[in-house]
């Protein structure tokens, strides 16, 4: 990528804050995230974060178990992202890193209501922007919410940090040993091949706004590495 990166948006899963032992929000993992956000900010890069809520509740997965409807399940998932966002915001503040916690749902006692204008201003002031509650509507995932925020905030790059794969493959590498990883792939090919690394709506939004997406392993690599090292993960862009 030849364009200088000045503003990025990270999409991380709620799972990245939890441990296999059952800690919903693990102190070590939270501290790591804060340190990495500081490192990116120290590179004079404006940083936004969209975080999932799967460490607390997985709306779709638990919809049938809890006998609740899809809308309620998705709304519960949105609230889970707010819980994670509050934890990250407090951890950043404890480390003297200025931030703005926003929500697409109105809950003024907990977070500022998300608006593109106020959020862009916070980024320009050097604050880490934390965007919670996804797109703010049921039936839309946090991937789509992240793509929406990236478009509204005119991010130079959307980075999806995953816990299970280190990029985009032609098929699931966890199931197929002969899966082939792409170093670079076009938006259109991701869509035409039905590669499920992100929602089709998220890919389409970024394609329309010409925002490249880098998919990388948050287990193997840091946030800073994902921005600057073009050999990490997979870049989804206009031309492969």
From Swiss-Prot:
Family annotation (NCBIfam families): pyrH_bact
Protein name (Swiss-Prot/TrEMBL): Uridylate kinase
UniProt: UMP binding residues: 53, 74, 135-142
Enzyme class (EC, first level): transferase
Pathway the protein contributes to: Pyrimidine metabolism; CTP biosynthesis via de novo pathway; UDP from UMP (UMPK route): step 1/1
Family under the similarity heading: Belongs to the UMP kinase family.
GO biological process: 'de novo' CTP biosynthetic process; UDP biosynthetic process
Documented activity regulation: Inhibited by UTP.
Protein's organism: Chlamydia felis (strain Fe/C-56)
Principal location class: cytoplasm
Name of encoding gene: pyrH
Pfam families: AA_kinase
């Amino acid at each position: 990528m030849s364009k200088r990166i000045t503003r990025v948006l990270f999409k991380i899963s709620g799972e990245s804050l939890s441990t296999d032992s059952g800690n919903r929000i693990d102190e070590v993992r939270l501290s790591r995230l804060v340190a990495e956000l500081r490192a990116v900010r120290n590179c004079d890069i404006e940083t936004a974060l969209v975080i999932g809520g799967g460490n607390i509740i997985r709306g779709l997965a638990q919809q049938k178990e809890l006998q609740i409807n899809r809308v309620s399940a998705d709304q519960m998932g949105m609230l889970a992202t707010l819980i994670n966002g509050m934890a990250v915001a407090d951890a950043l503040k404890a480390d003297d890193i200025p931030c703005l916690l926003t929500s697409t749902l109105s809950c003024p006692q907990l977070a500022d209501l998300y608006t593109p204008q106020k959020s862009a201003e916070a980024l320009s002031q050097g604050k880490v922007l934390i965007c919670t509650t996804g797109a703010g509507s049921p039936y839309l995932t946090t991937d789509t919410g992240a793509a929406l925020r990236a478009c509204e905030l005119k991010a130079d790059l959307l980075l999806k940090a995953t816990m299970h794969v280190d990029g985009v493959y032609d098929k699931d590498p966890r199931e197929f040993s002969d899966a082939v990883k792409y170093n670079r792939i076009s938006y259109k090919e991701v869509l035409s091949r039905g590669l499920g690394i992100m929602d089709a709506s998220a890919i389409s939004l970024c394609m329309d706004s010409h925002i490249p997406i880098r998919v990388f392993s948050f287990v193997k690599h840091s946030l800073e590495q994902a921005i600057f090292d073009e050999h990490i993960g997979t870049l989804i862009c206009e031309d492969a």
